[in-house]
Amino acid sequence: MRCPFCGHADTQVVDSRVSEEGDTIRRRRRCLSCDKRFTTYERVELAMPTVVKRDGSRSEYDAAKLRGSLALALRKRPVSTEEVDGAVARIEDTLLASGAREVASEHIGELVMNELKRLDKVAYVRFASVYKSFEDIGEFVEAIREMQGPRLGAGKLRKE
């Protein structure tokens, strides 16, 4: 591998470690010319499916867009970056495991909603309100009822 500091073609692997998830190898390398050290990461490159939008247009899968959607819904919520990274990884794993060459944007939206429901209920309602285009307060209430299940009955929403 070429040295990023001096451009020399010969480097030596000093140390290799497998990540905790087992899907990445971290390698410490030393340049045989300038003696500087640097880190590289090796992982399998899999092609994500093409996203088919509601209007029928197609675009490449964009992990930054997925992460941005999650971050927006989770803004000012007590969810760590590691938890967001885990959600992105689970969504991507699901998409890759499907083996599909194309995936509907609606399917990705449903995967995001499932992850948000697990991570943070408020973020779930935020995302659902935009994703499902809520038009009135009744739709918010219905989404909350569905999420809460039988614990939130109609009697608890009435003013006493």
Swiss-Prot record:
Sorted UniProt keywords: ATP-binding, DNA-binding, Metal-binding, Nucleotide-binding, Repressor, Transcription, Transcription regulation, Zinc, Zinc-finger
Any one GO molecular function term: zinc ion binding
Gene name per UniProt: nrdR
Chain's role: Negatively regulates transcription of bacterial ribonucleotide reductase nrd genes and operons by binding to NrdR-boxes.
Start and end residues, zinc fingers (unnamed): 3-34
ATP-cone domain sequence ranges: 49-139
Protein name, as recorded: Transcriptional repressor NrdR
One Pfam family, short name: ATP-cone
Entry superkingdom: Bacteria
UniProt record, GO biological process: negative regulation of DNA-templated transcription
Cofactor (UniProt): Zn(2+)
Cofactor note as given: Binds 1 zinc ion.
Family (UniProt): Belongs to the NrdR family.
